[in-house]
Amino acid sequence: RLIEQTDGDIYFEEKRLKDYDLRELRLKTGYVLQQIALFPNLTVAENIALIPEMKNFDEKEIKEKTEDLLRKVGLDPKHYMNRLPKELSGGEKQRVGILRAIIANPKILLMDEPFSALDPISKVQLQDLIKTLHNEYKMTTVFVTHDMDEAMKLADRICVLKEGKVVQIATPEVLKENPADDFVREFFARGNK
């Protein structure tokens, strides 16, 4: 919770968000941001291990899971575990950021424009990776994007907002075929040119 909501309630695991201890809530949530926030003085392995260490995971389990996840995203553990963030490309940094967000099996993954600064090839690769990881780990993912092609590719359901208000929540197919109003229709028409 960065900002308290002004109206209504948001529930997570049948409990109102405002009733959670903030630390408990944060440890159940993974974050991937547009600005890749790796700690520059920590190795790839140390960056990935931060949350599991806070949750008192076994050291051996952390190492094994880190190596396994690195392999899953195409980063050979032998070559990447001990590298510093400055030695990685933008796409590699974002992969590490994603792994750090999911290694402790969060219930919710929040992704805020995570691919907007990447080249087109890295962007497509990471979109595919997110779909694969989402299906494998079965976590709820809240993905913020202004890229309608990206939303259509990645989302099970899309929430369209206008001036902070919900205009429509629907599957990508329903949004395309039956937009709630002209704003939604134009929004998706512009995104699909």
Spell out what each predicted region is.
Residues 169-170, 178:
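ABC ATPase "signature
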Residues 8-16, 25:
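Conserved ABC transporter NBD signature motif
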Residues 83-88, 92:
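Conserved ABC ATPase signature
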Residues 109-112:
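Catalytic Walker B motif of ABC-type/P-loop ATPase nucleotide-binding domains
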Residues 45-53, 63, 67:
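Short helical segment in ABC ATPase nucleotide-binding domains corresponding to the A-loop/adjacent helical element
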Residues 105:
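Conserved catalytic motifs of ABC-family nucleotide-binding domains
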